[in-house]
Structure formats: C-alpha cells, structure tokens
Swiss-Prot record:
Belongs to the GatB/GatE family. GatB subfamily. Allows the formation of correctly charged Asn-tRNA(Asn) or Gln-tRNA(Gln) through the transamidation of misacylated Asp-tRNA(Asn) or Glu-tRNA(Gln) in organisms which lack either or both of asparaginyl-tRNA or glutaminyl-tRNA synthetases. The reaction takes place in the presence of glutamine and ATP through an activated phospho-Asp-tRNA(Asn) or phospho-Glu-tRNA(Gln). PANTHER family: GLUTAMYL-TRNA GLN AMIDOTRANSFERASE SUBUNIT B MITOCHONDRIAL AND PROKARYOTIC PET112-RELATED (PTHR11659), GLUTAMYL-TRNA(GLN) AMIDOTRANSFERASE SUBUNIT B, MITOCHONDRIAL (PTHR11659:SF0). InterPro entries: Asn/Gln-tRNA_amidoTrfase_suB/E, Asn/Gln-tRNA_Trfase_suB/E_cat, Asn/Gln_amidotransferase, Asn/Gln_tRNA_amidoTrase-B-like, GatB, GatB_C_1, GatB_Yqey_C_2, Gln-tRNA_amidoTrfase_suB_CS. It comes from Parasynechococcus marenigrum (strain WH8102). It is an enzyme of class 6 (ligase). GO terms for biological process: glutaminyl-tRNAGln biosynthesis via transamidation; translation. This is Aspartyl/glutamyl-tRNA(Asn/Gln) amidotransferase subunit B. One of its GO terms (molecular function) is glutaminyl-tRNA synthase (glutamine-hydrolyzing) activity. Keywords: ATP-binding, Ligase, Nucleotide-binding, Protein biosynthesis. Heterotrimer of A, B and C subunits. Pfam families: GatB_N (PF02934), GatB_Yqey (PF02637).
Length: 491
C-alpha cells in the first residue's frame, strides 16, 4: 500500500515597507506632510532634474538603525546606496535609490504571539533577513479603473516621492495567514513604540507585500513563489494568504501551472488576481549610486542610539505577566499601544494594584478613549487619580458599583475620586452595627420570603442581598452584608 502524501504546507515571507516619520524627505528638505494638494512637496531633487545631488537625511539613518536594533538585526559598519532601474510614471528619475547587496542591517528576528482560531496561543520566532533604506515612489490615481490597465488616463502625485522608507524583509518562516498578520502587526507595534513611524496603513505609512508558495511537507523544496500586493489591513493580509494558499493547492492538484507573478488582493471580491509577471533582481540592473558616498555608523554612534531605545512590547508583555501577575490577554491589550502602557505604568507607580488597574484601563477607560478619539495624554482623568480610585476600591472604601457611577464625571473632568466620594457621602457602609440595623428592617419588611428561605429556598438569599444593596444605594460592604444576612436568615 502506497504511503500517504505529506500534507500541503504554505511558505510565506513578508516585505514590509515602513515610512519613516521624518519631517523632510530622505535626500532633500522637501516636506513629508500627508494629505496636502498634489505636487506641492516636490523640488528639483525629488524630480531628478539635471545637476541636482541627493544628500542623506541623518534622521533617516538614525531611525533606520534604531528600527534595526529593535528587530535584533546586526548593524553594518559600512553600507551603500544603489540605483534600482525601472520605468514607471510614479518614478520621476526612472530609478529608485535603494540598497541592494550592502544593506544597513542583516540577520535578525522577532518573537510573535499567534492566536489561531480553535488553538492555544503560541509563540513563534520569525527570522528577519534584512532592513534597508530606500526612497518611496509617487502615487498614481487612475481614472475609470483601480489600476493602469483599463483606465482612461492617470494622474501622478509626486508628494510621496522621496519619502524615506525602511524595507524589512522576513525570512520564509511563516506558515499561515494568521502568522503573517500577527508578524506584520508586531512590526507596526515596534515601529510605533520607537516613534520612527506612525504605521498608519490607511495613509500608506506601512505597506506589506506577501511572498507565498506551497509545498508537500516541510522537507519538500520550495514551490513557485507568488507576490501579493494591495493589502491595507492585517485582516486583509490574513485573508489574502488564506485565499492564495487554497488557490495554489487547487492548481497543483488539478495540474494547472503556478507562474511567478505579482497578484493584487481584491478586497471587494475577496480574491487575488493577476497583475504582472514578477521581475528578478537582474531586471533592475542595480549599481552603486555614484552621487552618494558610503554609509558608516561608528560603534560609539550605534551604542548612543541603542541607549535611547524604549522597552519594547514583547519585553513589556513578559514583564507584565511574570512580575505583575497579569493574564497574557491583559498584558497583550495593555502593550498594544505605548501610550496605554505608559498610562498603566503610571497608575501602578502611584501605588495601585496592577490587576485592578488593568481591568479599569482595558475596559471602561479604553472604551472612553476610543469612542471619543482621545489620546491618553488628552485624558482629563490622570493616572494618579485612577490610582486613587483603585485604592479606594481595594481598601474597601467604595464598591465597584459606586466607582462606575462616578467614573463618567472623572473621565470628562478629572479630579479627586476621594473628594467626590466624601462630598456626596458615597463611602461604603462597613460598620457592622449599622448594617445589622438595616438587615433587621429588611427582614421585618419581607416575612414571607424569610419564612420561605428558612423552609429550604436558599436561593432567596440573593433576593435579600439585592434588596440590601438597593436600600443602601450599593454602598453596603458586600462581604460583610452577606455574612450578616446569612446569620440573621438562619435565625
């Protein structure tokens, strides 16, 4: 009996283009502002006019090196720029200044948490082949079609041309669409933590191209690689990979050839479609750019930049779980954006319990910030004020119900939770004698329910707890109230 063939396996790598958040472009002082009128941020260097010379923006080099360090890449002591030759309307010089065989950084990795549907969350280490600097191209707007073919005419906006990019090339270590999406998400998270890019996919600040093939099991040679473009969300990356995996497997099983090509993800139709044949490196005729000198980063400069790196999200996640006792879920949510993590840490530093603080921040406070499109810096309810509220709850001074009642006002105006509680008499009733008197009144008012409870209907204790909370406006100490009720009901 013939052995069963190994299961199909996808092999996926990502090329992630990160727009570096410098005020001026990579080789000129022209502005990088987004959303302005077309062709208002151009100059002779951007347009490649005769006699112009590019000069490397040193902030671009700093951001690229810091990004590379955060991705555990080895920084090259010497690297250079190359000209990548191709002809397209959005490329004014008819070549792109990039880095080919001597990039600024090589051989790194990041660790990602992957939550596949129906499976336990797992950690995966993804290799990174290189990071190199290059200039962005302009943008084409096609009339009558979403692509050049089929359009009646095209307009070119060169505002984006010359904006600095860091291209991050992963190794082919990804195996599912979910892994690809999580990897891209972690790259964006790291870049935002560093402050080198806003990572806004809708504005094109972060763009991902997927290279994908399938093969029969992990020991089989790689299949024919297909590149996918036009994915503007992490969800689109996952869905495009999943569709393409199925398409390629079906093609192999039906004898249809897979060609090396570039395909576009069609979000509306939820499929990939052929765009053009894929070029190889030789098609671009790379050669060193004669107008730009070699790039040298000294050991002292590297170490100075390394000392400025913040604590990165993966390190924070581990610390929150291991040192603060948070769940993996809470640690992940809190570290997704650096401002939220900074807010949380300020609350804990002010003396609040970490788990209670995490619950309030990831719940009501995050909902308020998101629905009102606020930054944490703009939030009137400052970390030390939230810490005060958490301490009131933790110390039994107020109930969670009371905290929820005063929270909307605090979120809108800020202020001292303790002052509000004292001024309005909202403190928790924790005096046993006072609670006993209230319980006696309550039992006297409900003799039938007391008789039913003593006859075996123990669930009625919940009724009495509810009535007690109603009578006290939610201010009764729940633990003490239950103890007194239990004792009184049993007679």
């Amino acid at each position: 009996m013939a052995a069963a063939e190994p299961a199909w396996e996808a092999v996926i790598g990502l090329e992630t283009h990160v727009q570096l958040g410098t005020d001026s472009k990579i080789f000129t002082a022209a502005s990088t502002a987004f959303g302005d009128d077309p062709n208002t941020h151009i100059d002779p260097v951007v347009c490649g006019l005769p006699g112009t010379l590019p000069v490397l923006n040193q902030k671009v080099l700093e951001y690229a090196v810091k990004a590379a360090m955060a991705l555990n890449l080895n920084i090259a002591e010497h690297s250079k720029f190359d000209r990548k030759q191709y002809f397209y309307p959005d490329l004014p010089k008819n070549y792109q200044i990039s880095q080919y065989d001597e990039p600024i950084a090589e051989e790194g990795w990041i660790e990602v948490e992957v939550a596949e549907k129906g499976k336990d969350t797992y950690l995966k280490k993804i290799g990174i082949e290189r990071l190199h600097m290059e200039e962005d191209a302009g943008k084409l707007v096609h009339a009558g079609s979403d692509r050049l073919a089929g359009s009646t005419h095209s307009l070119v906006d060169y505002n984006r041309a010359g904006v600095a990019l860091a291209e991050i090339v992963s190794k082919p270590d990804l195996r599912t669409g979910r892994e690809a999406a999580e990897y891209a998400s972690e790259i964006r998270r790291i870049m935002r933590y560093l402050g080198v890019s806003d990572g806004n996919m809708q504005e094109g600040s972060l763009r991902c191209d997927v290279n994908i093939s399938v093969r029969r099991g992990p020991d089989a040679p790689f299949g024919t690689k297909v590149e996918i473009k036009n994915m503007n969300s992490f969800s689109a990356i996952q869905k495009a990979c999943e569709y393409e995996i199925k398409r390629q497997i079906k093609a192999y099983e039906t004898g249809e050839p897979i060609v090396q090509e570039t395909r576009l993800w069609d979000e509306g139709k939820q499929l990939t479609k052929s765009m053009r044949s894929k070029e190889g490196a030789s098609d671009y005729r790379y050669f060193p750019d004669p107008d730009l000198g070699p790039i040298e980063v000294s050991v002292d400069q590297r170490e100075a930049w390394r000392s400025e790196l913040p604590e990165l999200p993966a390190v924070k996640r581990h610390r929150y779980a291991d040192d603060l006792g948070l769940s993996q879920y809470d640690a992940r949510v809190l570290t997704d954006e650096r401002p939220m993590a900074d807010y949380f840490e300020a609350v804990v530093a002010a003396g609040a319990d970490a788990k209670l603080s995490a619950n309030w921040i990831t719940g009501d406070i995050a909902a308020h910030v998101n629905s009102n499109r606020l930054s944490y810096a703009e939030l009137p309810f400052r970390p030390e004020q939230l810490a005060e509220m958490v301490q009131l709850i933790d110390g039994g001074k107020i109930s969670g119900k009371i905290a929820k009642e005063i929270l909307p006002e605090l979120l809108e105006k800020g202020g001292s939770p303790k002052a509000i509680v004292d001024e309005r008499g909202l403190g928790m009733i924790s005096d046993p004698a006072a609670l006993q008197a209230i319980v006696d009144e309550l039992l006297a008012a409900h003799p039938d329910e007391v008789k039913a409870f003593r006859g075996g209907k123990n669930k009625l204790q919940g009724f009495f707890v509810g009535q007690l909370m109603k009578k006290t406006g939610g201010k009764a100490d729940p633990k003490l109230a239950n103890q007194i009720l239990s004792k009184k009901l049993k007679g």
